[in-house]
């Protein structure tokens, strides 16, 4: 069981690197590609768009394929998206790379939680999910500074090349450590949004939207702000 949790935690670490790593390389990216810093900041939004679009769509396939195969597909998208971003030299291709790399983000957390709920004893599921999510925290503590260092010493492309290669290792860990199980629950896209008929979810959405907007409005441009304004 520990290997399953570790595999999923490695996956969330890679997702955290991809999501937040862009913030530490924003100025280098803008200079290298020949776009403005605000335009480079759009890459953060494209990733977020991929997260929003990807999660509900992937959920539709949770009953058609094994959860292990879905996880492998999601991590493969991480590899492809970050590789595309690494090799891109135009705004359009950068945007597509970020969109693809963001697509599996929300779905990975959801599918990973389902896997853990099926193989972990009921009283320990919460701790197991926390272990999976800890990969994101470690990415913020260790991964992002490493990515920023690589960008400053070599190139921002090395940062995202590292993320792509790391996700290949994540695919191997999922293949060997995650059991081949299925989620038999049936559903369709419309059913996923039935809960929006009540006002309570909209209040939660508003709170999280404005809260995250406040954080990311500062966090996204913290490097150019510290370099050119403070």
Could you tell me what each predicted segment is?
Residues 4-37, 58, 218-223:
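Extracytoplasmic
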Residues 6, 81-84, 92-100:
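Paired small-residue
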Residues 202-230:
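Extracytoplasmic gate region of multi-pass secondary transporters
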Residues 55-66:
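Helix-to-loop junctions at the C-terminal end of transmembrane segments
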Residues 69-83:
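Structural signature of the two symmetry-related core transmembrane helices
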Residues 93, 122-176, 221, 225:
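Helix-loop-helix hairpin linking two adjacent transmembrane segments in secondary transporters
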Residues 34, 66, 87-93:
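Helix-breaking motifs and short loop linkers at transmembrane-helix boundaries and internal kinks
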Residues 97-135:
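Cytoplasmic helix-loop-helix junction between adjacent transmembrane helices
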């Amino acid at each position: 069981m520990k290997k399953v949790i570790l595999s999923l935690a490695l996956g969330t670490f890679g997702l955290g690197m991809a999501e937040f790593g862009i913030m530490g390389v924003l100025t280098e990216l803008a200079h290298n590609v020949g776009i403005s810093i605000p335009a480079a900041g759009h890459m953060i939004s494209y990733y977020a768009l991929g997260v929003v679009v990807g999660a509900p769509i992937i959920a539709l396939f949770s009953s058609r394929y094994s959860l292990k195969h879905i996880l492998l597909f999601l991590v493969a998208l991480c590899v492809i998206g970050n590789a595309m971003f690494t090799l891109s030299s135009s705004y359009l291709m950068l945007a597509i790379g970020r969109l693809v790399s963001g697509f599996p983000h929300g779905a990975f957390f959801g599918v990973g939680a389902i896997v853990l709920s099926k193989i972990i004893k009921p009283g320990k599921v919460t701790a197991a999910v926390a272990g999976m999510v800890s990969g994101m925290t470690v990415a913020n503590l260790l991964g992002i500074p490493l990515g920023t260092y690589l960008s400053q010493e070599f190139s921002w492309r090395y940062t995202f090349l590292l993320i792509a290669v790391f996700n290949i290792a994540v695919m191997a860990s999922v293949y060997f450590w995650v059991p081949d199980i299925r989620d038999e629950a049936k559903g369709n896209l419309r059913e996923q949004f039935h809960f929006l008929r009540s006002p309570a979810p909209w209040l939660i959405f508003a709170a999280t939207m404005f809260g995250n907007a406040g954080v990311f409005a500062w966090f996204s441009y913290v490097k150019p702000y510290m370099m050119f304004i403070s």
